[in-house]
Amino acid sequence: MKDVVTSPANLGKFQDPDVTADGQTRASVALSHPETLWFNTGTLCNIECANCYIFSSPSNDALVYITESEVRDYLSQITERGWPISEIGFTGGEPFMNPEIIGMTRAALEAGHEVLILTNAMRPMMRKSMRAGLLDLAQDWRDRITLRISVDHWSEALHDEERGKGAFALTIEGMQWLRDNGFAMTVAGRTVWGESEAQSRDGYRSLYAEHGFDIDADDPAATVLFPEMDETAEVPEITTACWDILGKSPSEPMCASSRMVVKRKGAEKPAVLACTLLPYSPEFELGETLAEAERDVKLNHPHCAKFCVLGGASCSG
């Protein structure tokens, strides 16, 4: 399984890790300030979205369930390497499909980290065992747990267009439970429908007001509007000269501040990846340990350019 199929518009690009198609030095990013370590809990999901970047579905187990013991090992490595990690993120798939998500979350909290869980807040989260687990964690660590809810669009019709009929209502039900039990929430939306950012934020603001959700529609970290990853679009390669031209710093892309741990189907051990967006590209797999994952990342993928450098996206909260 690949992350992207090279489109005709990008033929000849993103081939050599060191040099762009026109012979310039390709930009790279150092792990300058590790702040977030992500764990992919597995690619299994309770739904199959129309345009999921990681192809999560009820049948895709390309990334299998990571275990609590494996997570604890990486938490120990954080201490050993002296990484100043403030946040542990859990993503999927749907994290609440993984039967050990509560234990993994507890391990991260016990280690002193903030925890961010990306979820659709649907039936997996609303199972009795998961709700009980969240409430138990909240007794000691409520102020260090945030759930980022996938609300692709503020309207039911367009959200369900992406996620299936009835998905919006189930997500709102889950958010209402989180609201009623005092959990901090943020929202991840999308920009595929051609609205301006102001229009999108106005729509989310109305949604939050309707349901009494304490979420700031104007804060880009609280209502995250992700740019679309159009695999057919032509994108420029990022050279070392681009930083000054664009007025950006190599400390800004996600790979300057985060890594993601995954466990591939059939693999004996988990692996550490440079980026949450490229789970299937071998060149972005850095090794099995955090020590191996400290090396620089060459921006040799269309997503690096369009989504991270030009789109300015970040997965952290």
Residue ranges and their predicted role:
Residues 209, 227-317:
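Accessory C-terminal segments flanking Radical SAM cores
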Residues 73, 77-81, 107, 137, ...:
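A generic secondary-structure signal
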Residues 84-88, 115, 141-151, 166-235:
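Conserved C-terminal portion of the radical SAM core fold
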